[in-house]
């Protein structure tokens, strides 16, 4: 069996979407991850041999030889690890003359990244023009086609969705403030008038508790965030608002409806906050998308 070293430490949403590799690759995978996000990974999977915290990875793995190292972090520490652990082949990011570089088979993805060999301006333009999903770009690194392989993450099967509960994630990370949306309060009011209970997702003591909160929802509304990816992993119907990040990269798995800001091109991956951007999608548009979602009939009958 092919012995694979997979280095993908964060962020949480990126870890979720990278789990498609568990279902797409054949081999014995050792996954190096930030210990904060380890609870996201499934407790068991036939291709997931073990999970190693990044802090202990060098000492744990330095005497092993891998058939294939997959290095997916644009980070010096992770690239150094990928360069040091003995392997027969590497795909992705590694260090060369103290610089982050990437292998040719990973260029489809990393040409659009912060470490792009094309330079920042060209990389952003390539990303803007891209029509492939992350899953397609990821599997292309290995000469594979994406055939709808699902995410595979932790789930507490004792938790069942409550049919009138709508999860709402209003929070966004500091890096992309324009992922936010100003219409949540008004939307929540409209949904409550229909008899739904809106569950505002909050910071939890650990990430598994946060995932459990989502698992108890019958529907989810958010920006392009971890919650969106978890909803798709759990087959929870959802709506996601795209103000500044690429909607093309997100495969919808038949459960996600995307609402795209008319200011997307102007705000594309901009890191400075713009009130006009987070105001650019109307409450009526999101409300209508909710009512038109194919899953709503089953919710209304509950």
Positions of PLM-derived features:
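Catalytic machinery of carbohydrate-active enzymes
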Residues: 1-302
């Amino acid at each position: 069996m092919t012995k694979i070293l997979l280095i993908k430490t964060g962020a949480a949403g990126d870890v979720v979407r990278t789990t498609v590799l568990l279902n797409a690759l054949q081999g014995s995978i050792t996954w190096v991850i930030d210990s904060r996000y380890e609870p996201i990974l499934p407790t068991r999977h036939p291709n997931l041999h073990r999970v190693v915290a990044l802090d202990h990875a060098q000492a744990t793995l330095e005497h092993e030889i891998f058939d294939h190292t997959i290095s997916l972090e644009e980070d010096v520490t992770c690239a150094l690890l990928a360069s040091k652990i003995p392997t027969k082949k590497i795909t992705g990011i590694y260090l060369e003359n103290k610089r982050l570089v990437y292998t040719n088979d990973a260029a489809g993805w990393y040409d659009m990244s912060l470490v792009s060999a094309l330079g920042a301006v060209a990389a952003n333009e390539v990303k803007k023009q891209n029509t492939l999903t992350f899953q397609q770009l990821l599997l292309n690194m290995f000469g594979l086609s994406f055939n709808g392989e699902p995410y595979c993450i932790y789930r507490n099967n004792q938790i069942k969705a409550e049919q009138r509960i709508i999860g709402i994630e209003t929070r966004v990370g500091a890096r992309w403030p324009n992922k936010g949306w100003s219409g949540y309060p008004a939307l929540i009011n409209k949904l409550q008038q229909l008899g739904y209970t809106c569950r505002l997702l909050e910071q939890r003591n650990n990430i598994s508790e946060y995932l459990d909160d989502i698992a108890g929802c019958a529907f989810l509304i958010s920006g392009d965030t971890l919650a969106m990816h978890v909803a798709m992993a759990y087959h929870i119907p959802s709506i996601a608002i795209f103000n500044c990040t690429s909607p093309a990269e997100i495969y919808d798995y038949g459960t996600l409806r995307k609402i795209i800001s008319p200011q997307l091109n102007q705000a594309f991956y901009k890191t400075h906050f713009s009130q006009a951007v987070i105001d650019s999608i109307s409450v009526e548009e999101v409300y209508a998308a909710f009512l038109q979602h194919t899953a709503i009939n089953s919710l209304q009958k509950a």
